[in-house]
Amino acid sequence: MDFINAPKSICTEVGTETHDVFDRILSSAHVEYQRNRLRLRTPDESVETSHGRVGGRKGHAAYFRIVPSKAGKVVSVRRRIKCPKMSHRAQNLEPTGEKAEHTIIDLAFSKTGCRKTITQYVGHKVHCSRCKRDYQPPAIERFRGRLFGHCFRAWAVYQRVALRLPYSAIVGVIDNLFAERVSAAGIVKFMWQIAEEYAATEALSLKKILNSPFIHADETKISICGSQQYVWVLTDGIHVIFRLTETREATLFHELISGYEGVLISDFYGGYDAATCRQQKCWPHLIRDLNEDLWKHPFHVEFERFVVALRELIVPIFDDVDRFGLKKRNLHKHIKRVDRFYKLNIEGKQIDSELVQKYQKRFQRYREELFTFLSHDGIPWNNNTAERAIRHMAIQRKISGSFYKQGAEQYLRLLGIAQSCRFQDKSFLRFLLSGEKDIDKYKERKRPRSSRRIDKANGE
């Protein structure tokens, strides 16, 4: 009989103790654990606290957008003075007597909410005798024929990227809240437009990532029109960018980090091994593999001895990480213990077990990469930051199932910006509304308090 709170596999007493220690180490890699600053101890010690295509299908009826006839605000804009062509700059433009009008539907945000606005921009057309063409006022031309303003489009993008709403749901929300009819293709167009406007933000994030002392990297599968492709993530814990490739080959990844002189933190996928910079491999990945094999082979004495020896090595190391942080002066002393572990269990010990040999080869291959964090300040020993950055993409993958390639590229750019805002505890929506292109320069506005603490001592 199996109980819900009982392990599904049996193991020895030593194995149970080792599983418990490894579970504690894996838990210590989580963000919540690092915030709470729990210390690692062995079991006998106390634990202390310290998308669709753009446009309709062929054969479907076409629709013409009806522009609102009543505007809540009318803005007069200046006419163009000089011809936009460089060779005609000296040519004065003559008024044609015709009016240029453009209506924008937008959202106005305040501290307590938002409301729909309809603004009509009115100006005069001018004519260039050399170009033989008419020109509208610059303030009207910058709208590029768009009916919806920046804040409206940014709000729709926020619903899709941050809240993961399907296009059909966003269409319904817009209809119910703002009484505006927008098609799913219209939402896709919003995504394209906003992604294009914030291309500079992504480029700036990549530049800052490459200037950081360490980079977290990871990859995951994605379905593009039913074909399996891969999404790559790069992050320094503050900025995030994504890239899409057709295969798992790391060519594009190596091009991105070409010339990087910091430390690359990754899992054990072979594509990362060709990086020319220093590397730190993810310990939780290795510990999970050891834990899984220990469950599968509970009575494998030689493997159990190997795992126990490793446990005795890493527990004091991670205990010092929790106590002192990732400081070289406190961790460098463990290098001698690492050398002793390799001498006794890797280099000077021949074991017939294929399972143990597999891990011996793995430890030998990644000897330097496993312990880089002991010799440098501030280098994380896990890759959970990259996994945290890419998890949003994994959830969206379950919801959407498949993406179109071009739509996926725009989505990933916006997701990188959203995750960068999240890592900096900033609102993705309010960043888009601000018009700022540098996430680091954007400052969150203080929000009004919605609650206050109850003082029980005063009887409140």
Please name every model-derived segment.
Residues 1-144, 188, 217, 223:
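Short, flexible loop/hinge motifs at secondary-structure junctions
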Residues 3, 31-34, 46, 53-59, ...:
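RNase H-like nuclease fold core
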Residues 7-9, 28, 269-271, 305-460:
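Acidic/histidine-rich catalytic cores and adjacent linkers
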Residues 127, 158-166, 226-240, 283-286, ...:
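Short conserved beta-strand segments at catalytic cores or DNA/RNA-binding microdomains
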Residues 268-269, 273-309:
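Conserved beta-strand -> loop -> alpha-helix junction used to position metal-binding or nucleic-acid-contacting
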Residues 25, 83-86, 128, 156, ...:
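Mobile genetic element proteins and their domesticated derivatives, centered on retroelements
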Residues 149-163, 322:
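Short, amphipathic alpha-helical "recognition" segments used to contact nucleic acids or chromatin
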Residues 168-179:
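DNA-recognition alpha helix
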